[in-house]
């Protein structure tokens, strides 16, 4: 392992011990805010500190085994122990490097997931419905909660656009790589000649941001329109102008919300989504500037980001960012997404490790 990485690990291990001592101090316990902040820091440092301690122990085992090689009677056993210890050290070094990667503070947050039908008319709206169902099933498997914020249904089913808030542990960290263009190739139910059609949808995933961190929005920059809800919603639909459309004039970002019967609730939801969208756009712009020399696996939610192709006749899904093809389309559409998410998370970590190595 590089000396610069060992030095970083030593500093983090020392800080872990320092924080542990501070947490036992009466003055810290009396100051609840400081105690909470230090408790969080202690939890964040615990894994790396424990792994580093184990790695140091393995280094000692390697030294002991190397010394034993000089003894003819112990040589065979020493060679075996040395081989095992080196393999353990290598495994731990990989773990430590991943633990050293910069954490995205948004990863643990809830997320807004937007699915929009693109080219392909009714078929694109149906596919948007299929994608939303896929994400909902995945959320269910992880015990996350799905709340529809706004839905604009397609004429023959599916959605022209649907926005949902998904709440639970680590939602954004798992779903953030879904942002971008998703393409479907299949024979529509209305196609009499059996021809395969290609349609597209875009997905945008944004972390839900606490109110204190939302960008300041000048009320003068907003145009707020009210209109009557359309689509599913029972007897209360079309009786009042409860639906809200907010346009942020400087950026042109538009958010609609018509899920609630109350105009006030729809407005609050729309403003929450708008704030997250503006922040996401600012972050994407910054990332684009930073990643101009390096590929960026995190999509912007723009249709030009071609993430995946879902080919129904062949039963396959291809992730174009990492050249991965899986022939388990039915499972994936039922929400078994880990086989697609895990490889891209690993690839992203490998890119981060390469960036870390460049810095050193």
Curated annotation (Swiss-Prot):
One of its GO terms (molecular function) is translation release factor activity, codon specific. It comes from the Bacteria. It holds the Pfam family RF-1. Signal peptide: none annotated. Methylated by PrmC. Methylation increases the termination efficiency of RF1. It is found in: Cytoplasm. GO terms for cellular component: cytoplasm. The keyword Transmembrane does not apply. The keyword Protein biosynthesis applies. InterPro entries: PCRF, Pep_chain_release_fac_I, Pep_chain_release_fac_I_sf, Prokaryotic/Mito_RF, RF-1. Keywords: Cytoplasm, Methylation, Protein biosynthesis. The modification N5-methylglutamine is found at residue 235. Residues 285-313 are annotated as: Disordered. Its main location: cytoplasm. Belongs to the prokaryotic/mitochondrial release factor family. Peptide chain release factor 1 directs the termination of translation in response to the peptide chain termination codons UAG and UAA. This is Peptide chain release factor 1. It comes from Enterobacter sp. (strain 638).
